[in-house]
């Protein structure tokens, strides 16, 4: 017993030292990230091997005599001219202007991982036909669209053309590399294979290959091929080197975006001579800005933009991935490019992209646009659209690590009412649970969680509690016992349950790649299983990269084993998506499939948009972190993840009051709006600041809540079409080169342009208003400005430049109450901003704000408002929808209007009625008072 007690004491000390070390990093707020904890490309052996291959003639040749053309795909064998290993290329034309390329081993020693559960369905194909052929190439025509694919045999290459214009080339630089599986080397002096240096995999069909000497030379094992060590961690690599890589050349393209998550510029940078962009979900403490290091999530989607074309590349691989970017115009200034143009330079701009992944197959979708909105639709057709969030989740969220107890929560709740500040959600971090045992409540601090939740519900507010995917190893903890007994944990390579260190101390990690595990997890959110939960409790998934304090790079060992025998290296980047998926499914199931979920996740992958919101992780209370939140969320929006935000105020350190105010002002115009703070920071609820800062924050909150109908409509459009809510300016103005690198301002939909104030002590900002023959109206003063131009605008502590584009109509709620649920039946005010042609258009989506009835019962309204010829018309934009609602039109504000002699309202079946109005000749603003018509009815208002 004494020995057992001593071991237990050592384990407690070990756990404490690890947690203190973790906290030391978090609390050592003068320190930046310790880069030595995270690999560079040179320290990642497969990246180093892949990157050592230089451009040249590819060693791969297509064997055209093996070409087979079926109804859905073309297949052809590829051979490596040195190793003689055969691969199989599967090429598919897809509907909606897409092409899919898959390359795998023809006869693998064991199957290679193919990423499941990301695509919403098998994409419908467009038939390929052979339209030309010679000894070294085949020309293929895609049945849908004016596209051709040229397959060149030697060296292997693919070219995609529209008519005679080259859109994209594959393997044009000869950088394709596919590390085939092989038997580990056996030293000559050893006669027993078990005595070899590498781990011996199980015998599988295909064993017994006898490579020729040329093959052996080509397959010479480099350091890290069969075993790799990083710091104190060893990766056994029982299946040897299995990396894949491929290059893509984009002629005519200079501007590329996407592949989040990185704390870097919106426009991706050239990586030659530096580090590639890394995609490997990691818990990075106090991440640095303006570098390509990996962060919490990975979306392997890249967008390329030019004046005349947009393209997308979706690299479907869940393993560690690096992306190299090169350009033949890198280093040239805008003046230099203009000079080339004026002098008739024949050099076509080109960007080259190189993808490198540690395992899996090559599986890539080429999305051919031609417009960026086409690319958005194409990607959404593959991986799904942004889930329609419940209305409350678009309101303001108040969080910190941690609110102490029930009394603290209720005091914060009351504080918002006492200071006339709206709030929808209060959050609880890890301290709310009993000893970090998730699905429980601390019996001392939160003895009556149902009473607390009921009190919040009476205020029409919600609570979010954290549920992380690491489970305390404790024989008295029901969650752990069930997972262990059902064999649902991730395993070590020897078959035991994997254990690592995280917040609870020793923890095991549920294997979310297992459908049984996901079903079990979802069931845990039922009200019977999650004691103390209620319908107004929602969930936050943190640490789901997964974070392992004592693991390599603060994550799981790559040779850990998942469902189906797959290694963690194969599935790493999809783990967080599975956690998000299972949690969202659990919240849906607990309501019998009626209620929409809200789940925030830190880790993500392609497809995560279907399950909820994400955020930019543990940022810092510094002005540069405020600035970087814009390109970080814009990059996510471009690849489908619209529901993004950054911790308002910064997670680490204490923000000065001015910074906190500016962060609220920016957060009010970002999709996910949550203030959050570290355990060691001072309390920063808005009413704790001096009155002038309180007033500025209150104004920001009011702006957010008044725009909720607009936000909700934008999210419905994102849900239906796949269009981003928060957009770079270039998305709306694809031919305006001035917008291509702008990342300090952005648009919401096509209507609002926002330029946050992100410099300390700023008295003004430079705002670029794009668009030939566009007009922009300041939403506060209604002053009209013409585009394109750059304006210097003075700002005060309480102001932030926001403009409404002429030609748009924005619906608003003007009666701000304590929460969104208190406002959902309030009347609407329409803000009509007229274009120079005197026209405008906008939409309004309404439903009950929280159920799936808009889908299952068509209980919704989608209204279209159009202004033309001095008439404002309301009509249904989707006749399938129907909704009984008390909401009516309270007011119409028309910017850019002259004074009419009369204003007349017409509704079906009713006589004309005159409306009272007020006109300001200085601002050209016309206000129509109380039309009094139902938002659900058809009507028209005529200015005479």
Swiss-Prot record:
Chain positions with Phosphoserine modification: 52
Active-site residue list: 542, 618
Leader peptide range in chain numbering: 1-32
Identification of the protein by name: Neutral alpha-glucosidase AB
Positions annotated as glycosylated: 97
Catalytic activity, reaction form: N(4)-(alpha-D-Glc-(1->3)-alpha-D-Man-(1->2)-alpha-D-Man-(1->2)-alpha-D-Man-(1->3)-[alpha-D-Man-(1->2)-alpha-D-Man-(1->3)-[alpha-D-Man-(1->2)-alpha-D-Man-(1->6)]-alpha-D-Man-(1->6)]-beta-D-Man-(1->4)-beta-D-GlcNAc-(1->4)-beta-D-GlcNAc)-L-asparaginyl-[protein] + H2O = N(4)-(alpha-D-Man-(1->2)-alpha-D-Man-(1->2)-alpha-D-Man-(1->3)-[alpha-D-Man-(1->2)-alpha-D-Man-(1->3)-[alpha-D-Man-(1->2)-alpha-D-Man-(1->6)]-alpha-D-Man-(1->6)]-beta-D-Man-(1->4)-beta-D-GlcNAc-(1->4)-beta-D-GlcNAc)-L-asparaginyl-[protein] (N-glucan mannose isomer 9A1,2,3B1,2,3) + beta-D-glucose; N(4)-(alpha-D-Glc-(1->3)-alpha-D-Glc-(1->3)-alpha-D-Man-(1->2)-alpha-D-Man-(1->2)-alpha-D-Man-(1->3)-[alpha-D-Man-(1->2)-alpha-D-Man-(1->3)-[alpha-D-Man-(1->2)-alpha-D-Man-(1->6)]-alpha-D-Man-(1->6)]-beta-D-Man-(1->4)-beta-D-GlcNAc-(1->4)-beta-D-GlcNAc)-L-asparaginyl-[protein] + H2O = N(4)-(alpha-D-Glc-(1->3)-alpha-D-Man-(1->2)-alpha-D-Man-(1->2)-alpha-D-Man-(1->3)-[alpha-D-Man-(1->2)-alpha-D-Man-(1->3)-[alpha-D-Man-(1->2)-alpha-D-Man-(1->6)]-alpha-D-Man-(1->6)]-beta-D-Man-(1->4)-beta-D-GlcNAc-(1->4)-beta-D-GlcNAc)-L-asparaginyl-[protein] + beta-D-glucose
Keywords: Disulfide bond, Endoplasmic reticulum, Glycoprotein, Glycosidase, Golgi apparatus, Hydrolase, Phosphoprotein, Signal
GO molecular function annotations of the record: carbohydrate binding; Glc2Man9GlcNAc2 oligosaccharide glucosidase activity; glucan 1,3-alpha-glucosidase activity; glucosidase activity
Outcome recorded upon mutating residue 818 to E: Disrupts interaction with PRKCSH. Nearly abolishes enzyme activity
Annotated InterPro entries: Gal_mutarotase_sf_dom, Glyco_hydro_31_AS, Glyco_hydro_31_C, Glyco_hydro_31_CS, Glyco_hydro_31_N_dom, Glyco_hydro_31_TIM, Glyco_hydro_b, Glycoside_hydrolase_SF
Alphabetical list of SUPFAM superfamilies matching this protein: (Trans)glycosidases, Galactose mutarotase-like, Glycosyl hydrolase domain
Compartments where found: Endoplasmic reticulum; Golgi apparatus; Melanosome
Organism for this UniProt entry: Mus musculus
Composition skew (Basic and acidic residues), residue ranges: 207-236
An annotated GO BP: carbohydrate metabolic process
Enzyme Commission identifier(s): 3.2.1.207
């Amino acid at each position: 017993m004494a020995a057992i007690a001593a071991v237990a004491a050592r384990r407690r000390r070990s756990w404490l030292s690890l947690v203190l070390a973790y906290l030391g990093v978090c609390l050592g707020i003068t320190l930046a990230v310790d880069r030595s904890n995270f690999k560079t490309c040179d320290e990642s052996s497969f990246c180093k091997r892949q990157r050592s291959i230089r451009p040249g003639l590819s060693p791969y040749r297509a064997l055209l005599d093996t070409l087979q053309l079926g109804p859905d795909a073309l297949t052809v064998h590829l051979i490596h001219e040195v190793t003689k290993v055969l691969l199989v290329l599967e090429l598919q034309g897809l509907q909606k202007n897409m092409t899919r390329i898959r390359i795998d081993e023809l006869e693998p020693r064991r199957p290679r991982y193919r990423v499941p559960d990301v695509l919403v369905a098998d994409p419908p194909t467009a038939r390929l036909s052979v339209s030309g052929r010679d000894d070294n190439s085949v020309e293929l025509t895609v049945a849908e669209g004016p596209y051709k694919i040229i397959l060149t045999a030697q060296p292997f290459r693919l070219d995609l053309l529209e008519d005679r214009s080259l859109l994209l080339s594959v393997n044009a630089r000869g950088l394709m590399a596919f590390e085939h599986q092989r038997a580990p080397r056996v030293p000559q002096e050893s006669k027993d294979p078990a005595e070899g240096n590498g781990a011996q995999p199980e015998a599988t069909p295909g064993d017994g290959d006898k490579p020729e000497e040329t093959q052996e030379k080509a397959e010479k094992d480099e350091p890290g091929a069969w075993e790799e060590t990083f710091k104190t961690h060893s990766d056994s690599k029982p299946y040897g080197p299995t990396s894949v890589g491929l290059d893509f050349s984009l002629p005519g393209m200079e501007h590329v975006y996407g592949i989040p998550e990185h704390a870097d510029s919106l426009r991706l940078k050239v990586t030659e001579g530096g580090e590639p962009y890394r995609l490997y979900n990691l818990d990075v403490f106090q991440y640095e800005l303006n570098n390509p290091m990996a962060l919490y999530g990975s979306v392997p989607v890249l967008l390329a933009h030019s004046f005349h074309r947009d393209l997308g590349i979706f690299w479907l691989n869940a393993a560690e991935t690096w992306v190299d970017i090169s350009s033949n115009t890198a280093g040239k200034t805008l003046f230099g490019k203009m000079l080339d143009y004026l002098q008739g330079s024949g050099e076509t701009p080109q960007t080259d992209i190189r993808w490198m992944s540690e395992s899996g197959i090559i599986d890539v979708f080429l999305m051919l646009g031609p417009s960026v909105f086409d690319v958005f639709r194409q990607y959404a057709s593959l991986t799904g659209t942004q889930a329609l969030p419940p209305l409350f989740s678009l309101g303001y969220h108040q969080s910190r690590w941690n609110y102490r107890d029930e009394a603290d929560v209720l005091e914060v709740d009351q504080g918002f009412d006492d200071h006339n500040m709206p709030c929808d959600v209060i959050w609880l971090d890890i301290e709310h649970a009993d000893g970090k045992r998730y699905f429980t409540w601390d019996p001392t601090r939160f003895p009556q969680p149902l009473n607390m939740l009921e009190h919040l519900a009476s205020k029409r507010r919600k609570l979010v509690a954290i549920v992380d995917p690491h489970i305390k190893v404790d024989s008295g903890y029901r969650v752990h016992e069930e997972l262990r007994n059902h064999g649902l944990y991730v395993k070590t390579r020897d078959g035991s349950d994997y254990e690592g260190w995280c917040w609870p101390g020793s923890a095991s990690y549920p294997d979310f790649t297992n459908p049984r595990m996901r079903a079990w997890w979802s069931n845990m959110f039922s009200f019977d299983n999650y004691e103390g939960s209620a319908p107004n409790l929602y969930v936050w998934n943190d640490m789901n990269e997964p974070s392992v304090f004592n693991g390599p790079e603060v994550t799981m060992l790559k040779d850990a084993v998942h469902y189906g025998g797959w290694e963690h290296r194969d599935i790493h980047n999809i783990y967080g998506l599975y956690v998000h998926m299972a949690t969202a499914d659990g919240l849906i199931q607990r309501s019998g499939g009626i209620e929409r979920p809200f789940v925030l996740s830190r880790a993500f992958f392609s497809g995560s948009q279907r399950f909820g919101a994400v955020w930019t992780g543990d940022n810092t209370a510094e002005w540069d972190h405020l600035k970087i939140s814009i390109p970080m969320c814009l990059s996510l929006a471009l690849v489908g993840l619209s529901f993004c935000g950054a911790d308002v105020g910064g997670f680490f350190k204490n923000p000065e009051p001015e910074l906190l105010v500016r962060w609220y002002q920016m957060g009010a115009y970002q999709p996910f709006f949550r203030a959050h703070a570290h355990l060691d920071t001072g309390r920063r609820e808005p009413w704790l600041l001096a009155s002038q800062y309180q007033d500025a924050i209150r104004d920001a909150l009011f702006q957010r809540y008044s725009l909720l109908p607009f936000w909700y409509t934008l999210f419905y459009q994102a849900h239906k079409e796949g269009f981003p809510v928060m957009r770079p300016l270039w998305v709306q103005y694809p031919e305006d080169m001035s917008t291509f690198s702008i990342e300090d301002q952005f648009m919401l939909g096509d209507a609002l342009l926002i330029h946050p104030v992100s410099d300390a002590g700023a008295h003004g900002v430079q705002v670029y208003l794009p668009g030939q023959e566009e007009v922009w109206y300041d939403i506060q003063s209604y002053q009209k400005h013409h585009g394109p131009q750059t304006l210097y605008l003075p700002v005060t502590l309480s102001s932030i430049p926001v403009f409404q584009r002429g030609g748009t109509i924005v619906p608003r709620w003007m009666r701000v109450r304590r929460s969104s649920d208190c406002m959902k039946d309030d009347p609407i005010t329409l803000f009509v901003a007229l274009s120079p042609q005197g026209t405008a258009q906008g939409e309004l989506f309404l439903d009950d704000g929280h159920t799936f009835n808009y889908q299952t019962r068509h209980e919704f309204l989608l209204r279209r408002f159009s202004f033309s010829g001095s008439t404002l018309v309301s009509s249904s934009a989707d006749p399938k929808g129907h909704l009984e609602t008390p909401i009516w039109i309270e007011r119409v504000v028309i910017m850019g209007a002259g004074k009419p002699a009369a204003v007349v309202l017409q509704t079906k079946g009713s006589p004309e009625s005159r409306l009272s109005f007020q006109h300001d000749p200085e601002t050209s603003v016309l206000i129509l008072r109380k039309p009094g018509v139902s938002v659900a009815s058809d009507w028209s208002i005529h200015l005479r």
